[in-house]
Structures are given as structure tokens and as C-alpha cells.
Amino acid sequence: MRSARALLLALALRVCALDSETPSAGCTFEEDDDLNQCEYSQGEDDDFGWELVRSYMMPHLTADLPHGSYLMVNASQHAAGQRAHLLFQALSENDTHCLQFSYFMYSRDGHSPGTLSAYVRVMGGPVGSAVWNASGSHGRQWHQAELAVSLFWPSEYQVLFEAVISSERRGYLGLDDILLLNYPCSKAPHFSRLGDVEVNAGQNATFQCVAAGKAAEAERFLMQRQSGEVVPAASVKHISHRRFLATFQLDEVSKGEQDLYRCVTQSSRGSGVSNFAELIVKEPPTPIAPPQLLRAGSTYLIIQLNTNSIIGDGPIVRKEIEYRMTSGPWSEVHAVNMQTYKLWHLDPDTEYEISVLLTRPGEGGTGKPGPPLISRTKCAEPMRAPKGLAFSEIQSRQLTLQWEPLGYNLTRCHTYSVSLCYRYLVGSGLNQTFRECAKMERNANRYTIKNLLPYRNIHVKLILSNPEGRKEGKEVTFQTDEDVPGGIASESLTFTPLEDMIFLKWEEPVEPNGLITQYEISYQSIESSDPAVNVPGPRRTVSKLRNETYHVFSNLHPGTTYLFSVRARTGKGFGQTALTEITTNISAPTFDYGDMPSPLGESESTITVLLRPAQGRGAPISTYQVIVEEDRPKRIKRELGGQECFPVPLTFDDAMSRGSVHYFGAELPASSLTEAKPFTVGDNQTYSGYWNPPLEPKKAYLIYFQAMSNLKGETRLNCIRIARKAACKESKRPLEVSQHSEEMGLILGICAGGLVVLIILLGAIIVVIRKGKPVNMTKATINYRHEKTHMMSAIDRSFTDQSTLQEDERLGLSFMDTHNYSNRGDQRSSVVNESSSLLGGSPRRQCGRKGSPYHTGQLHPAVRVADLLQHINQMKTAEGYGFKQEYESFFEGWDASKKKDKTKGRQDHVSTYDRHRVKLHPLLGDPNSDYINANYIDGYHRSNHFIATQGPKQEMVYDFWRMVWQEHCSSIVMITKLVEVGRVKCSKYWPDDSEMYGDIKITLVKSEMLAEYAVRTFALERRGYSARHEVKQFHFTSWPEHGVPYHATGLLAFIRRVKASTPPDAGPIVIHCSAGTGRTGCYIVLDVMLDMAECEGVVDIYNCVKTLCSRRINMIQTEEQYIFIHDAILEACLCGETSIPASEFKPTYKEMVRIEPQSNSSQLREEFQTLNSVTPHLDVEECSIALLPRNRERNRSMDVLPPDRCLPFLISVDGDSNNYINAALTDSYTKSAAFIVTLHPLQNTTTDFWRLVYDYGCTSIVMLNQLNQSNSAWPCLQYWPEPGLQHYGPMEVEYVSGAADEDIVSRLFRVQNITRLQEGHLMVRHFQYLRWSAYRDTPDSKKSFLHLLAQVERWQKESGDGRTVVHCLNGGGRSGTYCASTMILEMIKCHNMADIFYAAKTLRNYKPNMVETLEQYHFCYDIALEYLESLETR
């Protein structure tokens, strides 16, 4: 009853509702409805149909369904996804209306039975997207929804309901009461009419949908495209209480998006649907053809637009021209209103790209540029000629010019040429002009004119040309530098020879090549017929001023041929030499007689005279003649030296027949009178056809001795009166004979006594020499000559001379001489042999004995070279005296004197130094200008051999050069850098080219830079002097800023170079550091001790230093310097001189490798053993960085570690920022730190390796091992990319190219730090040497190894001479062999000598394992020999 009552109530309510709403169309599916009138239909393209349910006809209807009549879908009876369509009748309503319907969705378990959707199809078009949908389980009741479709006449639409079965397939969907109401919907908003939108392609399209109703009724706003796409609303804006605006935007629409669009609101209670509006997309127009060129000029182009055919939509409302340079980023647009257009203000010779732009209405209506016209303007005449013509370098025969870079604004054409035209005068009279024009390369602003004449005015101008014209620049005049002059013409040399003089005249060179400043004439005797003249003689030089073209050479030897060389000099040096040979005339012989000697004997008819040999002058004596002349009473007597001699031979018989007063009594060949011998005049003998008759007792005679020289038809003779015989009287004849006999006896007695004295004197000299005592040979010679001249004097006079000689022997002995006077006696010979061996095996040179001020002491005797090693070891271990005590003893006397009397001590000190101070010649008007802080220091047996001075300050530079000039110094030794520890230690007192210091002009002639020192050669000229001095400066650059050098190898080589380069007759050697004390003193002591060790086999360092300190204060400043001197002398004695001249290398090497049978060894093996003994061993403290725990894994072996002092610390940052790598910086012969020796990179050090290469600017890598060597504990991996690019930490390594032959693989890499790209890249060439087998100590081929050295050298020159990384397995033996070989080749090229020991020793000072084995050391000799032999075959 209750259910029946409820049903009746529901039916009553429904009837009331229907009566009040009165729908104009629809379907309620009730029993009394005519279903044919409902105008709905089932879909034809769905899966199943809707089921009509009438509950009163179904008694067994499930309780899940409501009662009544409706359409229903049972989800459980259909498959998931199947659809059922219900189509409502087509509607064309012009007024506002509402489509209302009820729906039922229920599932007992709450699952969704499916989805119910509503679609609105317009004008039979596509269904599109659903305008409304619902899903889920909504309970066992009906829900009502509305569709507010805003369509306007004549459009019609049809609503389609769709049920889709869910995957759960449970429950029911129902549809009922589909009614068309003629009033607005209350649950869905109504849209106003939506208008069409037109936009240009690429623009944004905006639809604005205005809806009436409650905005809250709309849960979503959508725009639906007719094809089905859905666009969400961009924004929703309330216009009033019941009106709101939904905006939809389509971005950058294209032609393909042109379609119909409508607005939709959606909610569970219904949807609002607008009419379809069209989106119209217009394509902006673009010309089909490019514009047409009508005419081109240098600054304009005239074109025709050519816009008749277009692509896109019209109408065209604007035309524009867009143009730009084809190579430029900018563009310009000009509006055009005509079919032709002229583009102005264009650049000449420039390519332009010109396009036409067309525009239609609307935003974005401008189309893409049409096809471009590419055209080039013509060239224009150059703006002007190039300016700024100037020289960058002027030499004597070439001129390097530069000018302003030629920009486009100047050339106004890309096709142009620059010609450099020049002219200058030529010919002997400079009456001809040489002209030439050189065409420059493009973009060049620098050019070198070569093959010019020195010291000429060169007139130069630049001409700029292009196809439209040319511009000539102003002519600029330059003057080439001077050059050495040409040679003096040999035919211009004229001369007049005399006996001991030659007059020589010459003319100026035909090619002076500058201003002649000086002539230099050198002459040397090269041949002489006089055996007393030594040929070749010393070479002497005479300098003449530029206006003096003649000279008289005096003090020449007669009969001697001299080679004269004449050369002219300009500011650039001397020119070619003109040579001529001139022979002096022979001169008359000379006699060694003083006053007329007494005859040796005399009788009535004879007289015995002493004939002494004459000295030929220019020619040997050919004949001696004895002339007898009767001394008549009234005859004019001949005076000795002034008389005319007897050129015509005359026998006795001829003289008698002619009545001559003289005759030739004898003619003696020169060979018969080689020493003084008696001759009896009147002995009645015949000599060479001349009778020597007895003299007449009653006549007085003058006896003449004549010598004759004859050479090449030229005869010279000289005579001297040697005796006078008085006439005999009969009464006195016996007495005279008795007197003569007594005189003869006296003479013989005196001669015998003199001979005894002479023998005693010579014996004493021999004894002294054998005892090793020096003898003043000059004085001894004088005494001997004095004795010989006065042989006839008293015998006690001779003994007086001898006692004088003995007194000279007892003179005080010098420091150096004392060592020769020591009591070593018999030990000397053994010491000589030992020291000679230690000094290199060369014979000891002859040492001069000129005295020395170094006085030895008894407490500190000299040390034998053989005992030096033991002595130094004892001193270092503090056994005995010790270095510290010896060093401090140098200053004990100074302290005592200061305590006693400071004023006096200081005054004595000053006066002591002042005695040895260098005093300059005062300048005019400045008497105090004689001071310079410099002292004379004695060398070994050479007084004042050194000048110790301070490094010149700026204000003292002129005084320094005055001293060098005044003292005729040829060598300057500098042992400091200009700046050390941030402080100026010495001013740069020399020029880089040429500079005046006061009145002294210093010119740098040449410079030679080596790894440890530099040699600069200067020419000194002084105003008012014609002489020109050459001075060499030896600048040692390897002395560290603190302490002393780590090893003495380089310093010893430096000292030897200075000694070898200093002429023996030069002035003192100037030595300076900063203060002229410590380092200067070390150098002097080493120089003196090296000479002492070589000459005496001993060294006396202590007394040498002591004496030095008495000459100049603080000559040895620290105990460290004192110890260093000992170590350096020891190294010199152990190693000796090991350099070999290139010319002697082959025989020397052959001797060195010869096996001695007794020792079964060779000199080369012993030299290598010496190398091992002097190689320093590294202590743990010296390798502290390599031994740090964090660095252990970066070492291949803990036995081969680099010392801290040689480490190249890494600069590039990478991760942990560790800056250590197992590598060492080492010198070559010519460059400091030229090599970086390292081991083959490990897997964890590859990045470090490339950091090292980049940080230290290494342009070459030399690899001497093979990859994956089996004898390695770690595999040798490839550490480079090939091909391609690879990153190693911050380093980017790119393989650029490669080449290979049978010996070497060469690869080129580009390396850069990607964290510092602004630094640019580094080009590195990698040389992998293939000919060194894994188990060999030396390369397989010397020739291939030389090939490697040559390739690396060539690349180093091309790449700017960067450092070279050398590596093998452990960075030792092989790497050392390569570095040593490079050094040896540098020695040969620089100095034409090789010193293999020095090269190996230098490298081992950095790493003891360099040149590791005897075979590798031997190979270095082989490489030197191979290279020298290759030079001979070139």
C-alpha cells in the first residue's frame, strides 16, 4: 500500500510539472507517448542499441532499476568499450531555447557502468568532441542536465547521446525526458553570437566568447575545433553579474589551422555551446622573381622591383626594398612607391643582396623577402696613397720598411695593388740611377728591399692602384747603414823598400761603403835570407787616421820579405784585406868589436889578430877579407865606422904595380869563421888566391877586417880596423919581443881565469835549476855579457859579478815560488805525474816565473793534488783544523787591530788597500776624478793580473769604461745578474747596439748566449784616439741568488773559456760581481789555484785567500764560499780538461778506445769511471717533494726521483690541484732549462703530463721507448689521441696531422687549456723514435739517431724554440743520452769542439741516472764522430 501510494504521488507531481513547462518538443517515453512522434532514432554506426524499459510491463524487473518508461543500457550485457548512440531530432531554433534531459547511472558496487556523453552536430557536419559527459555511479535516482545551444538561423543542429561501456561492465545507464524548452537554461549559460576571425599567417588569433548566465554554472571553458581538437580558455573575465567573457588564443597560426571553432562550457549539470565561427588565415605576399638590376655605379645600384607575380594573399598595401652586404650582419629597408628604385650611399666594390618586401593588411602582413638580387658595386678611385712610410730596420745592404695598414676605406676596392718603387745612385761617379718597383703581396704593410749598396740615399715611394685609378705617395729618403768597406785595390799599393824601412802608400777603397774612420796595416816577416831572423815573425799592426794613406815602417830586418795587409775600417768594422809582399834591401854586415882590441901577438914581420864572425843583416856572410894598409905618415887616417871600405879586391902584386897603399892579404870563406879565432897577418900563406906576405918591419900597418854579403846580385860590405902595427926599430927589437911575450902570457892567464869563473857561474846556475829554484835569467844574462865584454879586466871583477848573482838568488821568495823551493825534493817527479794525470793527462805547461806577492805560511802548508780529496774529507768531518776555523782565522787580525786602536787600524787598513788601488787618469779640471772602487790583484806568477771592482752603478759607468781603456783590458768577467732578489745588483753598463759613455763609444759587435753564461764582444773607441780596442765581457748567469752554485762544472768551464780567450799580452782581467768581493774572490782563487795545481801539483788555498784579503776586503765572504772553492778545485783536479777540438777528435777518440794490454782497460772506460765517482748522490732531503705520500703513486720507481731544485711545478689547476710531476728541468749547452726530462706517463699521470707540456711552453716531445714494453712493471700506454680530440683534465689535445718513416713517427697536436681559452693554443710536435730496441742500452743506428736530432732541431727553429720534453721508461739513461747528444752537437756548431764528459757531468748534476751505462757514454762519442764525418762529406 505504501509503495502504491508513493507511485501515485510521483505520477501526480510529474503531471503537474509537464502542465506548467509545456515543452515544444521532446520525448518522455511514457506509456501514452507515441514513440514515433518522439523523433529520436538509434545510431547506425554503433555497437548496440538503447533498450526501452517500461517497469509496469516487467514484473520481474531488478530492484536496481527505477520504475517508469525510459531508455536503458545494461553494461553487464555488453563488452567494454562498446557504444550505443541515440540521435535526437534535428533542431533549427532561432530564439533562445534549452535542451533538457534526465539521466540515470547506477552500479550496486559503486563502479562506473560507463560514460554518457552528449554531442552537438551542426549542419550535418562532423560530430566533433563531446560537449557534455558524465561517468561514475550516481545512485538510484535520476539527474537532470541542460544543453544551451546558441545557433542561429538558418543553421540547424542535432544532439547525439552516446553510452560507452566501462571496463567493469557493471550497472546501468538510463536516459529519459529529453525535452526542448522555449526559455533559457537555468543550469547552463548561453553564448552570444561568435564572429569570424581573420589573421595573417604567423600571428596570434583571438576568439572572445560572451556568455549569459551564472559563471559558477560553468566548471570548464573550452574551444572546440570542428575537426575535434580542444583548446582551453586563456582567461575568463566577468563583465557584469550574469555576463562573462572567455578569451581563447591560438598562437602563430598557420594556413593549416584555418577551420571552424566554437566555445563550450561544461559542468555536471549541463553545457553551453556557441555557434561555429571561422578562423581565416591569410598568407602574406612574396614576389616570385628577384628584382632586376638596371645600372650599377661605385656608390649606387638602380633596380626594378619586378612584383607582378606573387605568392600569397593580397591586397598589397606597401612595397619595400631590403638590402644588406652579403658579408655583413646588418640590413636596411626602404619604402618604395615606384617600380624602379636607386640605392644611394653604397660602398664601392661591395657585394649587396637586395630583396623586395610586400605587405598586405593586418598585423604581420609583411611577407618574406622575395628572391634576392646579388650585385656588386664598382670600384672607386683610391682615397689617397698610403701614409706612414718609415723604416723598421736599416742595415747596410737591406732596408726594411713599413707603412700604415691599407684599409678598405683607403683602397675603396678589394682588387688593388701596392707597388713600392725606389731609386738610388750607382756607378763609380754616382752618375747613374738604379730604379725598380716591387709589387707587394696583398695585405702586406712591410717589405725588405735587399741587395742595396751601403751608405746610400734610397728614395722610396708607394703607389696604390685599383681598376679605377692610382695614387702616388710622397717620396721618402732613407740612408742605408754603413758596411765594412770594400777591399783596397792591390794595384793602388805603392812602396819604396830600404834596408830597415819601407815606405808604403795606398788609396781609399773603391767601395768605401761608409765613412772611412781608420786604416789598419798589419805586417809580418814571412821569409828572410838572414838566418838570425825568425820567420814567420810576430804580426804587428799599425792604425792610421782616415786622411793618412801612407806609412813608414821602421826597425825592419834587412833582406827580409814582409807580408803587408792593408784594410780600411768604417763604423761597421774592417773590410777586405789587400795583400802585398815587400822585401827590404840587405844591409852591410856588423861586427861585434868594441874599441880596437889589442893584438894577440906581434913580431917584426907578423901580427896576430883575433877575427870574430860578423853578423849578416839581411843576407848571410859570403866572404871575409883581411886588408893590410900601409900607414903612411901624412895620410889621412880612416876613422872606425866612418871609413870607406874596400869594394874592389886587390892582390899584393896588383897593389905593387898600381902603387896602392892597401892589398888583400887573405880571403876567407864564411864557413871557416864560425867562431872567433886568431889570424896571423904576414904568415906568407895564400888564402883563396890572395898572398899574405910578411910585413916589412920598418913600416907601420893598419889591419882591416872586411865582411861581405851577397844576395841576388846585391852586395853589401862592411869593414873595421882591428889592429895597428907600428914600425920596428932595431935597438928595441929584442925588448919588444920580450914585451910581446909577457903581454901574451898575461892575456892567456886572464883568459884562463875568466874561463874558470864562467864555468863556475854556469855550474851554479845548473845546480839552482835542478833544485827547482827560479833564477833571474835576465840579470844572469846581463852579468854574463858584462863578463864576456870585459874579459880582459881583473879576475876579482868576475868574482864580484858572481857574488852578485848569488845575492840575487837569496832574494825573498814569493808565495808561488815558495812551493818550488820546498823540501819536497825527490818527491817532485811523482807529484808531477799524479797531478798531470788528474788534470787530464796533458803535459804540464811551462810556467813563467815573474814573482808573486802571495806569501806562504808555516801553519798552513800547501796540499798535494794527490792528497786533496783526503784533505777535504778531513776538513768536512771536522777532523783536524776544519773549514770553520780556517775561515774565521782570516778576520782575526782585523778584530785585534780594531781593539787596539780603531783609528790607527782603520788608517793602516785604508793605506794598505790604497797601495793596490787602481788610479784613473784625472779628468781635466777635476783632480778628484782619479778614484774608482777597484784594486789590482796578482795572478799566478803575474803581477796585477786581475782588477777586482764592484758592479758599476749608473753614475760610475763612465769611470768603469775609462778604467778598461786605460788599463788596456781585453776581458771583463761579470758574476752577477742585473737584478737579484728584487734588488738592483749592477747597472747595465753596456749598450744593445752602440752608445757613447762620456767620450768613449761602446759598440756591441756580437753576443753569444749559452746556458750558463754569455759572451759579448765590444769595440771601444775614444774621442781623440785613433786606436780601437776590442773587449769581451764574460757574463756568468748561473750563480744562484743565495749561496753558491750547487756544482762547479759550469763555473770551471767558464773560467777555462775566459783563460783561453784572453790574449797573453792583454791588460788585467776586470772581475766584478755586485760589491766586487765574495764571488769575485772565489773566481780569482779558482783561477790562481788551477794554475798552481797544473804547474806544481799542489794547491795552497788558505794562503791564497789570506793574501787576497790583504788586497781587498771580504774577498771571501762566507764559509760556504770557502768550502765551495775546495770542492771546485777537487772537481777540476779529478776531471781535468776533457774538451777535444773537432780537428783532433778522430785520432783522440781512436786512442781513447784503445785497450791497454797491462790494465785491460781503455781511457774511455776510465773516464766513465771518473764520471761515476764525481756524480753527486741525492740525499733523501733533496727529494722531499717526490717522497711525500700524496706523490708516491706518481712515481714509476722510488729509486729514480727528481731533486726538489729541478722540479717543474705544474701551474694549470686540475681537481686536487697537485702540482708535482716526476720530471726535471735541465740545461742544454746553449739554453738554460731547455729540456724537461720525465718518465713515460703513467695511467694516473697522463693529465699531469699534458699540463706540464702546456704550462712550460714545450713545443717538442721526444719519446725514446716503445709502447707496452714487456720489461716494464707498468704498461706504457698511449697518452695521445690519434686521430681526433681528447680531454685530459683541463687540457684539450687535438691530433692535427702525422707522418712516419722507418725511424720516426711524427705527430702534430694542438694543445689548449679549456679553462684559459684566452691564452690560445700551443702547437706541439711529438717525435716517437722507433729504432731503440727494448733490451738495448743504445739505439740501433747512429745515423737514424742523428736524423732524430736534426728533425727536432728543425722543428724547434720553426716553432719558436720552446722547451723539449724528453722521456723514456724511467726518464734516465735514454733521455740523458739524447740530451747529451744534443749538447755535443751544439758544442761542435758553436765552438768546433766536443766535450762528452762535460755534457754527461752537467746532466748528472740534475739527475744522477742520466747517461746511465758505459755503452751509452760510448755512444755519445760515436754520435760526435758520426756527425763530424757527415760534415766532411757535405
Curated annotation (Swiss-Prot):
Location in or out of the cell: Cell junction; Cell membrane
Q: Which InterPro entries match?
A: ConA-like_dom_sf, FN3_dom, FN3_sf, Ig-like_dom, Ig-like_dom_sf, Ig-like_fold, Ig_sub, MAM_dom
Q: Name one GO molecular function term.
A: protein tyrosine phosphatase activity
Sorted alphabetically, which SMART domains does this protein's record hold?
FN3, IG, MAM, PTPc, PTPc_motif
In its UniProt entry, the species of origin is given as Gallus gallus
The protein's name is: Receptor-type tyrosine-protein phosphatase U
Looking at the keywords, is Cell membrane present? yes
Query: Where, by residue number, does substrate bind?
Result: E1041, C1073, S1074, A1075, G1076, T1077, G1078, R1079, Q1117
Instruction: Spell out the reaction equation it catalyses.
Output: O-phospho-L-tyrosyl-[protein] + H2O = L-tyrosyl-[protein] + phosphate
Looking at the record, the residues that make up the Ig-like C2-type domain are 189-274
Ranges facing Cytoplasmic side: 770-1434
Give the glycosylated residues. Answer: N74, N409, N684
Residue span(s) of domain Tyrosine-protein phosphatase? 876-1132, 1164-1427
What is this protein's function? Tyrosine-protein phosphatase which dephosphorylates CTNNB1. May function in cell proliferation and migration and play a role in the maintenance of epithelial integrity.
Q: Please report the stretch or stretches of sequence annotated as the MAM domain.
A: 25-187
The residues covered by the Fibronectin type-III domain are 287-382, 385-483, 484-590, 597-677
Q: Which PROSITE patterns match?
A: FN3 (PS50853), IG_LIKE (PS50835), MAM_1 (PS00740), MAM_2 (PS50060), TYR_PHOSPHATASE_1 (PS00383), TYR_PHOSPHATASE_2 (PS50056), TYR_PHOSPHATASE_PTP (PS50055)
The UniProt entry's GO biological process terms, in alphabetical order, are: cell adhesion; cell differentiation
